[in-house]
Amino acid sequence: MRGQGRKESLSESRDLDGSYDQLTGHPPGPSKKALKQRFLKLLPCCGPQALPSVSETLAAPASLRPHRPRPLDPDSVEDEFELSTVCHRPEGLEQLQEQTKFTRRELQVLYRGFKNECPSGIVNEENFKQIYSQFFPQGDSSNYATFLFNAFDTNHDGSVSFEDFVAGLSVILRGTIDDRLSWAFNLYDLNKDGCITKEEMLDIMKSIYDMMGKYTYPALREEAPREHVESFFQKMDRNKDGVVTIEEFIESCQQDENIMRSMQLFDNVI
């Protein structure tokens, strides 16, 4: 059951590779190894020393690895006190195990990393923007971070809790292809009315190009975002009614090999 004040998750550096260009407009990006390293920087607690399941060959550089965190034990006096000091107390591990596709051990490690970044137990939009901007210092990621935050904050209360974080992370990392595509659709559906308009997609495209900064400018022509939106709709809007529904979105993505390949980038990150 969802606890009071609960929303839906933080996380995912949407820095996919060039094969995802058909869907997001990203210019050619890092390899899966580089993506994984960036993801591990977002959550230092997910380094190989914390999660034994992480492949050593894809681990973050040693300089990025913090000390190995002590597992969270909800039955210990110390951790009980630690949990009592945060503004938002997370649901029990057993309940989160049932709601996500993470093991108890993974949830323990994720909680410690989340609390290190967000001692109060929740993160608001401004803090989220600050965290996200670290990964795109060459550009302006604020608009894209807002869209991403709203996708995680599904109850629209202006904050993301640990439960939200792991719920979204579970979809991104462990969800089925349909689950991931549905999550992506929700990200692009800015007003959450069940369809994507050209105006919404243009806002997304502009925010992506702004975020990538010097990796797209000055080579990027001013009209490039709008041209990409037209290409997107020509591909996705099957019945030509001017909007893209979730059914059209998922069907079109599933028929695109490049998009399907890019959806595998987060497999086995942790």
UniProtKB/Swiss-Prot annotation:
GO terms for biological process: action potential; clustering of voltage-gated potassium channels; membrane repolarization; muscle contraction; positive regulation of potassium ion export across plasma membrane; regulation of membrane repolarization; regulation of potassium ion export across plasma membrane; regulation of potassium ion transmembrane transport. SUPFAM superfamilies: EF-hand. Residues 1-17 have a biased composition (Basic and acidic residues). Pfam families: EF-hand_7 (PF13499), EF-hand_8 (PF13833). Ca(2+) 1 binds at residues 153, 155, 157, 159, 164. The keyword Metal-binding applies. PROSITE patterns: EF_HAND_1, EF_HAND_2. Residues 1-34 are annotated as: Disordered. A lipid is attached at residues 45-46 (S-palmitoyl cysteine). Signal peptide: none annotated. The keyword Cytoplasm does not apply. Palmitoylated. Palmitoylation enhances association with the plasma membrane. GO terms for cellular component: cytoplasm; dendrite; Kv4.2-KChIP2 channel complex; plasma membrane; voltage-gated potassium channel complex. The modification Phosphoserine is found at residue 9. GO terms for molecular function: A-type (transient outward) potassium channel activity; calcium ion binding; potassium channel regulator activity; protein-containing complex binding; transmembrane transporter binding. Its main location: membrane. Expressed in heart, brain and lung. In brain, abundantly expressed in striatum, hippocampus and olfactory bulb, moderately expressed in cerebral cortex and lowly expressed in thalamus and hypothalamus. Isoform 1 is predominant in cerebral cortex, striatum and hippocampus. Isoform 1, isoform 2 and isoform 3 are equally expressed in olfactory bulb. Iisoform 3 is expressed at high levels and isoform 1 at low levels in heart (in PubMed:11263977). It is a lipid-anchor. Ca(2+) 2 binds at residues 189, 191, 193, 195, 200. Residues 81-137, 140-175, 176-211, 224-259 form the EF-hand domain. Residues 257-270 are annotated as: Interaction with KCND2. Regulatory subunit of Kv4/D (Shal)-type voltage-gated rapidly inactivating A-type potassium channels. Modulates channel density, inactivation kinetics and rate of recovery from inactivation in a calcium-dependent and isoform-specific manner. Involved in KCND2 and KCND3 trafficking to the cell surface. Essential for the expression of I(To) currents in the heart. Required for normal protein levels of KCND2 in the heart ventricle. Component of heteromultimeric potassium channels. Identified in potassium channel complexes containing KCND1, KCND2, KCND3, KCNIP1, KCNIP2, KCNIP3, KCNIP4, DPP6 and DPP10. The KCND2-KCNIP2 channel complex contains four KCND2 and four KCNIP2 subunits. Interacts with KCND2. Probably part of a complex consisting of KCNIP1, KCNIP2 isoform 3 and KCND2. At least isoform 2 and isoform 3 can self-associate to form homodimers and homotetramers. Isoform 3 interacts with KCNIP1 in a calcium-dependent manner. Belongs to the recoverin family. This is A-type potassium channel modulatory protein KCNIP2. It comes from Rattus norvegicus. The gene is Kcnip2.
